[in-house]
Amino acid sequence: MNKTSDLRIIVLGAAAGGGLPQWNCGCRNCAMARDPASGLRPQTQSSLAVSLDGESWTVFNASPDIRQQVQDNCPLQPRRLRHSPIESVVLTNGDIDHLAGLLVLREKQAFTLFSTGAVGRIVSDNPVFQVLDPELVSRKTIEIDEAFSPLSGLDARLFAVPGKVPLFLEDGEPDLGIEGEHTVGLELEATGRRVYYVPGCAMMTDSLAARLRDADAVFFDGTLFSDDEMILTGTGRKTGRRMGHMPIDGEGGSLDALDLLNIRRKIYVHINNTNPIWRAGSERERVEARGFEIGYDGMEVRL
């Protein structure tokens, strides 16, 4: 491992599925994001990029917006006729906003795709993903808590977090909060630092809290501020927990749960278009007053 390297993390997309603004939504946040004078910038869908040397990168979740994300972030752009600094992609679940970008990466470019067996089967069972040339795209199945390296010198593990199967696999009422291969977090260790990426989490458990404690940085599920946010805004009928996402605020919320764990930097990502923390106001002030940061496209963290 190169001890002199920085662990460099770029938030490629800070929004949840649909982005901000969502194509068919006229909520307050989406209307503001369409107005250049509002100060609320549009945000793309959920993804991070990580590097140790600024040359080779791994991407966590392949957003439908990955072409735009590469365009917006110079370190990810090609440096010769046919080239990409993206050496690998790691999937944390099988949601559309984390898979669809794989189709954009189909243009005869080599990279390694890491996922659990359950998420890997979603990819292999869908013939549309055959556009990823198997001679160029190597698919690696990672067991829960198995050590692997998405980049040279970057130690990683996938670990189970409470969640559910993707929406398109639901058959009736899904089991909520189950821990298995369908929803995982990502643990990273390099340069003496320990970082976690958990874009989807249904609830905090004792084992998850113990894992996150004393981390240098945690990028965590910030989908909804309140559990009934989509119902109150008239944009949906489901609670956050029904969708597999613990709310930020309220009993059992992540604001209180993470605040107890002595985490150096706490950063919300995967933020829904309806979430009031996108704009100035009391909700954002409460989050920031507790020492949390609100992720945004292009945000860079160096450790």
From Swiss-Prot:
Keywords recorded for this protein, A-Z: Plasmid, PQQ biosynthesis, Transport
Keyword Transport: yes
SUPFAM superfamilies, A to Z: Metallo-hydrolase/oxidoreductase
InterPro entries to which the protein is assigned, alphabetical: Metallo-B-lactamas, PQQ_synth_PqqB, RibonucZ/Hydroxyglut_hydro
Signal peptide: none
Pathway where it operates: Cofactor biosynthesis; pyrroloquinoline quinone biosynthesis
A biological process from GO: pyrroloquinoline quinone biosynthetic process
Keyword Cell membrane attached: no
Task of the protein: May be involved in the transport of PQQ or its precursor to the periplasm.
NCBIfam families assigned to the protein according to its UniProt record, in alphabetical order: PQQ_syn_pqqB
Protein name: Coenzyme PQQ synthesis protein B
Gene assigned in the entry: pqqB
